[in-house]
Each structure stands twice: as structure tokens, then as C-alpha cells.
């Protein structure tokens, strides 16, 4: 599964133009620096480490899953920001949650590479993890981070690990919700609805070479009135589309998906876009 996810991401990156790849690399470098600074701050402060670890240990497994899912969503955002008609909105995490997730991921990485390290008393974890972090930083400063591969590969590895965890934990719970209610739908994100364009019917008819019908109510759109234009360039009465989008994030005509505030559905939406872009590149 990890190899498949890595292949999808790499194929999607290969489809980018040089300028888009450069912009993406700069964005990822900025994000990575921010995450490393937060992890360094947690490990260097006894008080902050204690508070962050306590917060992390207080979270249930579903809460940890949601935490990692939000982190994954924030990592996916830079990959989609340049894609036309496929908008995504940057995820803003509380500082306490960001500190918790970067510490959690570092604990998992440390346990995977050095299983015996965390068998020590938790009172010694900050010192042990701090030394491990310092050694990693010294290794990274050898020049690896000056090339695109050195910036992208750690990002891809983190993204794939988070995706795998969410697929196992969050995906299972998400499928259960779908099974509980056939035809399960999620509403469109409020920000996505607010961003929809208002277009005059005269201009709509001109661009479509004739009269336009709202497929929700099956009535023609009155000339001179403002109607809603979806990113897929389909048009609807505002009074029809707003109730629709309060329940479903899809276009009534073509099933184009708007962003949603449901974290697991949004991950699935963005991942499907990446899969399609990778398939087009391979084809």
C-alpha cells in the first residue's frame, strides 16, 4: 500500500511543470521548517514537552486519528493548490495540536528506527528524543536539504505514513458511517459555497448558445437574474443550489465535488484528484 501511494504521489509530481514544481518545493520547504521548529521547541522546553506529551496521552485513538487526518490534509493542500477547478483550503491547526502531531510522528519514527530507546522511563524521553533530533538535524545539514529530492522525499514519506494510518483507522470508521446510511453524503464546505460565482442569466445564455434550465427545479432561468456558477461551469438558481450544497458537496449535473469540512471525505476527494492526475500522466 505504501509503495502504491508513493507511486501515485511521484506520478502526480512528474506531471507538474518546472515552475509549479519549484513553487511546490518552496512551499514544502517552508512547511518542513515550521514543523521542525515546533518539534525543536517542544523538545528543548521541559514545560512544553510535558504539556504536549500530557495532551497527546489524553487523546483517545479516534482523537489521534483525527489529529493525524488534519495533519495529512495540511500536507495534501500544497499538491492541489495549482490545479484548476480543484480548489482546496489550507488547514489551520491549533498550535497545541500541531505540537502534538509532530511529537507523535517523531515518537513513531524513533520507535521504528530505534525500538529500544522508548523503553526507558518517560522521564528521560525528552533528553533521549532531543539527542536523536539533534543527530538528525546534523545529518540533514550535510547538504541533502539543498536539493529538491532532499526536500521532497521526507515530505512524501511523512505524507504516505499519515495516509496509511488514516486508511486503516479513519477510513474504517468512515466506511462504517457510510454503511449506516446508504447514500451517505457530506455538505460542501462553507468557504467553498461563499466563493461560488454569481453570473447574470444573459451572459449564461450567451455562453451556452440558448436558454438555460436549472436541473434541480427543471425551470428556465429568468433573464437579468443572478444565478450560481459552479467551478465545473454548470448553473443553478441560488434558491435551489444552496439547500442542495447544505447536504451534498457534488454538482447536481456532473457530480463534480466541492471541498467539504468533513476531514475524511476531503482527504478522499483530494486523493482521488491525485490518482486521476497520476493516471493521466502514465497514459
UniProtKB/Swiss-Prot annotation:
Which taxonomic lineage is given here? Eukaryota, Viridiplantae, Streptophyta, Embryophyta, Tracheophyta
Top-level taxon: Eukaryota
Q: Name one GO molecular function term.
A: ubiquitin-protein transferase activity
Q: What does this protein do?
A: E3 ubiquitin-protein ligase which accepts ubiquitin from an E2 ubiquitin-conjugating enzyme in the form of a thioester and then directly transfers the ubiquitin to targeted substrates. Modulates amyloplast dynamics and sedimentation in statocytes during inflorescence, hypocotyl and root gravitropism, probably by regulating amyloplast interaction with actin filaments (AFs) in endodermal cells.
Which organism is this protein's natural source?
A: Arabidopsis thaliana
- Localization per Swiss-Prot or TrEMBL: Plastid, Amyloplast
- Name the gene: SGR9
Expressing tissues: Expressed in seedlings, hypocotyls, roots and stems. Present especially in hypocotyl and inflorescence endodermis, as well as in root cap columella, tissues that act as statocytes.
Using the UniProt record, give the first listed, main subcellular location: plastid
Q: In its UniProt entry, what is this protein called?
A: E3 ubiquitin-protein ligase SGR9, amyloplastic
Amino acid at each position: 500500500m505504501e509503495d502504491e501511494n508513493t507511486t501515485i504521489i511521484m506520478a502526480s509530481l512528474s506531471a507538474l511543470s518546472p515552475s509549479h514544481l519549484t513553487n511546490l518545493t518552496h512551499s514544502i520547504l517552508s512547511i518542513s521548517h515550521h514543523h521542525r521548529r515546533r518539534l525543536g521547541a517542544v523538545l528543548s522546553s521541559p514545560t512544553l514537552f510535558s504539556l504536549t506529551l500530557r495532551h497527546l496521552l489524553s487523546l483517545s485513538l479516534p482523537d489521534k486519528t483525527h489529529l493525524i487526518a488534519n495533519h495529512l490534509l495540511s500536507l495534501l493542500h500544497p499538491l492541489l493548490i495549482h490545479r484548476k477547478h480543484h480548489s482546496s483550503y489550507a488547514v489551520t491547526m491549533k498550535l497545541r495540536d500541531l505540537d502534538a502531531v509532530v511529537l507523535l510522528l517523531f515518537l513513531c519514527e524513533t520507535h521504528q528506527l530505534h525500538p529500544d530507546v522508548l523503553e526507558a522511563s518517560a522521564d528521560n524521553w525528552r533528553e533521549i528524543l532531543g539527542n536523536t533530533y539533534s543527530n538528525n538535524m546534523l545529518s540533514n545539514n550535510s547538504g541533502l536539504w539543498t536539493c529538491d529530492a532532499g526536500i521532497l522525499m521526507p515530505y512524501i514519506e511523512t505524507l504516505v505514513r499519515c495516509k496509511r494510518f488514516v486508511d486503516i483507522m479513519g477510513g474504517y470508521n468512515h466506511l462504517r458511517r457510510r454503511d449506516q446510511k446508504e447514500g451517505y453524503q457530506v455538505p460542501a464546505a462553507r468557504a467553498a459555497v461563499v466563493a461560488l460565482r454569481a453570473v447574470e442569466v444573459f451572459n449564461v445564455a450567451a455562453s451556452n448558445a440558448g436558454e438555460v434550465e436549472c436541473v434541480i427545479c427543471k425551470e428556465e432561468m429568468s433573464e437579468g437574474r443572478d444565478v450560481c456558477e459552479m467551478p465545473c461551469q454548470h448553473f443553478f438558481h441560488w434558491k435551489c443550489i444552496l439547500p442542495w450544497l447544505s447536504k451534498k458537496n457534488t454538482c447536481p449535473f456532473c457530480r463534480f465535488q466541492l471541498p467539504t469540512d468533513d476531514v475524511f471525505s476531503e482527504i478522499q476527494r483530494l486523493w482521488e484528484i491525485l490518482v486521476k492526475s497520476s493516471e493521466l500522466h502514465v497514459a
